[in-house]
Amino acid sequence: MTTSDLVDLDRLTAFRYGILTWVDKEGFPFSVATDFVLSENGEILLKKPNVPVLLPRDRVAVLFNHITGIPTGGYTDRRYMLVWGKVTEDKGFLKLYPEELSEWDEKILPFDKLCAEAAPQGKKYLASIQPSIEA
């Protein structure tokens, strides 16, 4: 499986940075923001963060997210991609090998529907009213 089989690279380019997260050898979570680029081959290359702890290679998460504040209050344009996988070091970068993905974009699935679908009762309700919405 290639990166582009799991991750929509066009949508990924809409994000400006990623938050690299892992669990250290003592069992504590550690997170650091880092820049990223896509290689010509469609590989996700994270700028190697300068951190004083050992970065594991076998299991990391990278959160790419965006949110726009509304001056009068509230938020819009919310979206995220959470990619779990492995990394290898490559010329000052960490090459991400995606294994799992979860994502949400409110332009695709509005927030109220996301909340309703997250709850079993909400899913049943949406299924029951869907025919009347499509009519």
Task: Give the role of each language-model region.
Residues 1-135:
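Binding-site signature for planar aromatic cofactors or substrates
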